[in-house]
Amino acid sequence: MSPSSIRLYLVTAIMSGALIGVAALALPAQAEPRVFELSAPDAREVFLAGEMTNWSDGKVPMRKDADGRWRATIDLDPGQWLYKFVVDGKWIADPGSSDRDADGSGGQHSILFVGPGDWQVRPDIPRGHVDTAMVPSGLRSGGVKVNVYLPPGFERGKPYPVLWLLHGGNMDADQWFRTGHVERYMDNLLAREAIRPFVIVMPSDATSSYAGGSERFISGELPGWLQQTYGLRVDRRSSGVAGMSMGGYGAFRLAYRHPDLYGFAISLSGYFSDSYIASLSKQGTLPMQAVLLCGDKDDLVITNRKLVKALKAGGADFSYREDPGAHTWHYWSLRMVEMLTAADAYFTTGRLPMARN
């Protein structure tokens, strides 16, 4: 039901400004039993479904007690898990949990974090702030939604680096914030001085696939708004882009097309069409530094392998790694620290750490 082990990747070490390496360790996962409960005395049947059950494929029947509450207990490995209840055929978020977000299909999923990690909220440390704005754009009369993470003690006009985070399909700027809780990771990493302060910009893809009008907004209009609003200057030495799923493709595409703005791209489980891969096959070197990561049980691993083959044939310099995992936030949550520390390493040294097996 859950992986028997997870890979924990040690943070890139920086000493005197020099990159000294990235290591990988295979450690046994410390699974924890978790009890899921739902009060539904009139329901005929209730299932637990989520990333831990591959959603409907392995949904777990819940048992009804005399008090009208349905319960199920399963062991979960550390990390983030999305889930829902299926009540007499209707999929619902957990009414007992306030941590939830849009699911991209008109409903909501619930969010659970298991075990100690940088996903935890620590009340004893300084916390950053997330601004939400409808940024004026020629693309939409009402503007385009953007979330901006500002580190603790942010000062307008100070030269902060900028990491752009792109969301997946059918979602918006909230996904990295309200589902991924990237702000928690940032606060914790900053508190223990594992990274230096930088800003995270989470734009909405206003069209699709980060092309056309969406590309013009993100790479054309948004940098000017960031400078006007926060005093931030965006250039390749102090800016990079990352994303998951469709956002992984968007990160690679935007950095490839706008190397003056983005010095690196990190793609998590990106989708790359055959036509896009064909367009890159004869391009040779990449204009940006790039790291591609994908789960070995992700359906999109095939497109990633095709892209890797094409890039290698063209002589491109990049890094690719497959890890245990699927197309889930559980997988991405276990990559989050690596992604953020890699961005910090680039902002500090000018080099993006290569993903090591």
PLM region spans:
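N-terminal secretory signal peptides that target proteins for export/translocation
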Residues: M1-R7
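Boundary at the C-terminal end of the N-terminal hydrophobic targeting segment
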Residues: A26-A31
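Non-catalytic cap/lid and distal C-terminal segments of serine-dependent acyl enzymes
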Residues: E32-K59, R63-N357
